[in-house]
Amino acid sequence: MKRVKTYIPGLDEILYGGIPERHIVLVSGGPGTGKSILGKQFLYNGLTKGEGGVFIALEEHPVSVRRSFEHFKWDVRKYEREGKFAIIDTFTGGIGNVAQREKYVVKSIDDVKELSENIRAAIKDINATRIVVDSVSTLYLTKPAMARSIVMQLKRVISGLGCTAIFVSQVSVGERGFGGPGVEHAVDGIIRLDLDEVEGVMYRSIIIWKMRDTKISMVRHPMDITDNGIIVQWDKYLKISNWSVSIQPLPENEISQMKKAVEEAEKEVEVKVEGKEEEE
């Protein structure tokens, strides 16, 4: 099976090599859990490896999107100038001088046809393989009755063009859902991020809730947000109760299996790169 490595430290290990190619993965969590960071890190890491990326901004101004990348010193403007990165602006509706300079603008988020056409154009223009939609929760606020069908339409377009995508989804503080009725059934995978308070201390964690066609880690892992982005402590698991927190090492056999899976995925990437170079 072909996989897309996230290159996020520790994440490919708990995914046993990476995300299966063409999968649509929901990254869900409450405020401050790192959902958008994970999506942007996935996109930027691909850019550094020569993979084109498209960011679909549903609830953030394009200027803010670029600024948020820069916070981690991820220079997406460089790749934008090189024609390897694009932003699809559905936030401004094309209103304002700054918005008018954007190449891909969707004037109404309700216009699924216009959105799909912009996605197709951007993917083809930059030969994109990685897509991030932030966030699909906006669809449930603006078009709750049509939200699931819109998500399915986006999935058909993105996957049909050979891309692998992350859909960011918001949930309320303390909520253990995934951010919208039925969305969890429309996607191929779910990654859940959490931020829990225990005795006045905050703990970050990540768990792979589901991922079709691949083995996954079945425990909750500690994670950190650093100046360089997200780091997953893939060789440890987190146990949280109302009064205590325990971080334990994974069994050695699981660690070995994860390492082996990542090594095999890396070999697949090397073969893919070599084949691409020969074609050129």
Swiss-Prot record:
SUPFAM superfamilies recorded: P-loop containing nucleoside triphosphate hydrolases (SSF52540)
InterPro entries: KaiC-like_dom, KaiC_dom, P-loop_NTPase, UPF0273_KaiC-like
Domain of life: Archaea
The protein, known as: UPF0273 protein SSO1861
Residues at which ATP binds: 29-36
GO molecular function ontology, one term from the record: ATP binding
Entry keyword annotation includes Acetylation: no
Keywords: ATP-binding, Nucleotide-binding
Species the sequence originates in: Saccharolobus solfataricus (strain ATCC 35092 / DSM 1617 / JCM 11322 / P2) (Sulfolobus solfataricus)
NCBIfam families linked: thermo_KaiC_1
Residue ranges annotated for the KaiC domain, each copy included: 2-246
Upper taxonomic lineage: Archaea, Thermoproteota, Thermoprotei, Sulfolobales, Sulfolobaceae
Family of this protein: Belongs to the UPF0273 family.
